Amino acid sequence: MHISPQNVKSFIAKFRRQKILVVGDLMLDRYIYGHVNRLSPEAPVPIVRVRDEKNMPGGAANVARNVKALGSGASIFGLIGSDQAGRDLLNVLRADGLSSTYVTTVNKTKTTVKMRVIGDRQQVVRVDWDNKPAINDGLLKKMCLKAVKATAQCTGVILADYAKGLICPEIVSSILKAARRNKVPVAVDPKVNWNLPMDGIAIATPNRKEAFSLAGIPETEPARNPLNDRALLRASDILMEKWNPSLLIITLGAQGMLVARHARPPFHVTTFAREVFDVSGAGDTVIGTMLLALSAGANDIEAAELANCAAGVVVGKIGTATCSGKELLEFTRDLRR
């Protein structure tokens, strides 16, 4: 690792000065935990005897939860339905100390829910209730005005798109204009169908599959060394020219991440994960940690290493997990032993 232990501690301390606004699709992550000891006589599937249930913030709300866990202030901008799942989501947001001032409840709309059944520390099945909120012209105008106000009151913005309808040209343009006016850095986690404004963004964090799709070229088998992966480097070059971000981070799962920047060669950060139980939300951890680290004064390499370490903590847990500042500090210390 290039980052020194002293700098890790200093950056984490500076996280507390930040106030991050997370804009995106909100959903409820519901976990059913149990024990498996036999197969069903009805079908070749395991029977899970339920021991516990837990609701967690999902989607963009999990990004905010990650930011909060690292010590920063966090506000959420998004929509929920006027249903029990929406109320459950508000309850877990409050329990986690996340500001829901900019969360709007839409009547006659259902909240997206993703339920995961975990049997003996292994995910057995995931069940999704996907819903897109109905955003009429009146609501859209109010949301744009609210987005401008929220952006002016934060130190950084994360646009977390989960393809559920909130991230649209009008809201994104309003946020980017307000961010430029207030000199607020914006980080974007784009999905494969992203075709929205990207003017002036600081960070973009697609995964490998998304990067190839957004670059418009076919995905190839990964090379052993990402810096020798010609197709990946071509996708990176295309996206740097297309979006013009300060930093492009392509997350590569077990291979870590590739980081591209202007006028300098890209660099590769290997994964620091020691155990992998669940990759749910690892990308949320990366974008939140990157923005916080850069805002705290870390350079490109230091920020990428911190983000990879935080992701290493998260994938070693079951469920939509987070990494605290203390865990991040301990993880980086353990890597040096």
Where are these predicted regions, by residue range?
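Conserved phosphate/ATP/ADP-binding segment of small-molecule kinases
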Residues: 165-266
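Conserved structural-core and active-site-/substrate-pathway-adjacent residues in large, well-folded domains
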Residues: 25, 67, 115, 157-160, ...
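Extended, hydrophobic alpha-helical segments in both membrane/secreted and soluble proteins
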Residues: 158-159, 175, 186-188, 194-197, ...
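Conserved post-catalytic alpha-helical subdomain immediately downstream of the catalytic base
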Residues: 246-247, 272-335
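Conserved N-terminal subdomain of the carbohydrate kinase-like
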Residues: 2-5, 11, 17-20, 28-158, ...
